Each structure stands twice: as C-alpha cells, then as structure tokens.
C-alpha cells in the first residue's frame, strides 16, 4: 500500500510557505505604515488652481504653511494651509482705505475657489464686512456669512480681509 504524504507537511515546503507568508505580511505592514502625502501638497495644488483661474496671480514663497501670492489688485495676499482647527484661509490687504472693485473681485474669486461656494456670496460677505466698520462698531470686525468666518480690519494704512471656515463646517 502506498502512503501519500501531504506536500504541506514536508519540512522544505513548510519553511517556503512560512517565508512567503512572512514576506506578504511585511509588505502589507509597510504599505499600511507608509507615509501619506503631506497636506502641503494639497495646498500647493490649490494655489496652482488659483493661478490658473485668476489672471495675473503668481505664487510666491511658502513659509510655515502659508503660501504668499502676488496680484496687481492687492498689496499682500496669502493662502493659509489647513491646521488642526481651521481649514484653508484666504488673506488679502490693500493700501487704500476704500478698496477698488478689483480688490473685492480678487478676494471673492479666491475665496470662492478655495471654499467651493458661489463668488457672489463671498463678494457680498467681504463688502458687507468692510462696510460695517465705523466709529461705533469699530475698525476690527468679525462676521459670519454663508458659513464663512470673515475678519476685516480698516485702518489709515488700508484694508485687510481674512476669510476662513472652521473645520468640520
């Protein structure tokens, strides 16, 4: 009578199967613990999208999660990358005490692209915030419009607007 031996019971095949199992386990473990793409990559992509959509916009330096932007309608502009308690934010300033329509257009277009909401909503929110600054209310106003946090400051040196959205909203 012939005796059949199982292939998995031979010592050579046992060690080979163990080696293959170990290799698959290590490969899977490395794949799961591999570093994911950094948030700055998404922020850089967003800045490139802004330059493609807004004529005259150029990307400047990136320092500590903030991408500085250059545009003829603004003195300073930046795109803030996400952090723990905020999503992106858009900052723009001008030297004029009464901003030009080009300034508002830049702020509205950038915020609309970053937060994927209609441009008219961001335009109205920015204009409303700046128009509310006066002697009685003060020259440093925080407002909320269409789920956006809009902070504007009006001084003798000009107007500064920051538009952001709380994380999870």
Name every feature range the model reports, one short phrase each:
Residues 1-14:
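N-terminal secretory signal peptides that target proteins for export/translocation
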Residues 16-33:
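Bacterial N-terminal signal peptides
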Residues 33-40:
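Sec/Tat signal peptide C-region and signal peptidase I cleavage site
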Residues 38, 57-67, 116-146:
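Short glycine-rich, low-complexity/disordered patches
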Residues 41-85:
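N-terminal secretory signal peptides
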Residues 49-55, 87-93, 136-139, 159-163:
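Extracellular/mature segments of secreted proteins
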Residues 77, 83-133:
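Long, charged/polar, surface-exposed segments that mediate recognition or autoinhibition
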Residues 140-167:
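Short, exposed beta-strand-loop hairpins at the edges of beta-sheets
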């Amino acid at each position: 009578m012939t005796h059949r031996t199982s292939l998995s019971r031979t010592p050579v095949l046992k060690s080979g199967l163990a080696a293959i199992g170990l290799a698959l386990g290590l490969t899977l473990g490395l794949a799961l613990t591999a570093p994911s793409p950094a948030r700055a990559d998404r922020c850089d992509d967003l800045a490139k999208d802004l330059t493609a959509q807004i004529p005259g916009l150029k990307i400047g330096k990136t320092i500590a999660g903030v991408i500085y932007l250059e545009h003829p309608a603004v003195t300073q502009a930046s795109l803030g990358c996400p952090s723990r308690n905020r999503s992106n934010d858009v900052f723009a300033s001008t030297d004029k005490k009464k901003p030009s329509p080009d300034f508002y257009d830049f702020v509205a277009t950038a915020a609309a692209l970053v937060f994927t909401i209609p441009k008219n909503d961001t335009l109205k929110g920015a204009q409303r915030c700046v128009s509310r600054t006066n002697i009685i209310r003060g020259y440093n106003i925080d407002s909320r419009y269409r789920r956006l946090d809009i902070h504007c400051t009006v001084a003798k040196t000009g107007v500064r607007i920051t538009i952001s959205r709380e994380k999870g909203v």
